[in-house]
């Protein structure tokens, strides 16, 4: 079905999934993991996790297709930074330098992304600085998750750090008037 995506949060002892169609939540589920499937936030066996997710999807009648996954904090570098105003292209070029003290491999082995949290303007209203949430993760990490989800019958479309998932959730909740 168009506009359908299933989001997975793979924790230490449970996998949680939420199915969305057209941006609306349709179904949520959670299933306890067998012992030793995840250790220190990292999946021990991608093949075993793929089989677990495939079975979970089957048990809950989840249509296979587009998927999103929350990457554990142990696999993603994140920072809040302030930079001078610049274009998207300039930002993407400069992001690796924000992580120079943290990266353990060549910068071409990482995906980098950012979200603008706020802008600082001068007296004339021109953007002077950007306050950003920036992140980096190894390309091999994303490819491991892509292969795992493919084995389970899903097509990875979004991989995000847990901080972004929580930020998106709180942003959505702020739109609800209680």
Which functions belong to the PLM regions below?
Residues 1-102, 143, 173-174:
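Non-catalytic, solvent-exposed interaction/assembly segments
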Residues 176-178:
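Conserved small/polar residues in nucleotide/adenosyl-binding loops
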Residues 71-172:
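Active-site neighborhood for divalent-cation/phosphate handling
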């Amino acid at each position: 079905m168009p506009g359908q995506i299933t989001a997975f949060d793979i924790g230490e002892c449970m996998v949680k999934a939420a199915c969305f169609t057209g941006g609306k939540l349709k179904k949520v589920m959670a299933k306890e993991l067998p012992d030793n499937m995840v250790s220190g936030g990292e999946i021990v066996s991608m093949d075993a996790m793929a089989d677990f997710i495939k079975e979970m999807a089957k048990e809950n009648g989840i249509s296979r297709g587009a998927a999103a996954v929350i990457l554990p904090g142990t696999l993603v570098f994140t920072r809040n930074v302030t930079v001078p105003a610049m274009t998207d292209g300039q930002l993407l070029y400069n992001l690796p330098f924000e992580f120079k003290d943290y990266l353990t491999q060549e910068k071409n082995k990482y995906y980098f992304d950012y979200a603008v949290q706020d802008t600082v303007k001068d007296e004339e209203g021109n953007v002077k600085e950007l306050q950003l949430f920036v992140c980096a993760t190894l390309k091999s990490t994303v490819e491991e998750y892509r292969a795992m989800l493919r084995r389970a019958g899903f097509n990875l479309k979004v991989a995000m750090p847990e901080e972004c998932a929580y930020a998106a959730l709180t942003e959505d909740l702020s739109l609800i008037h209680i």
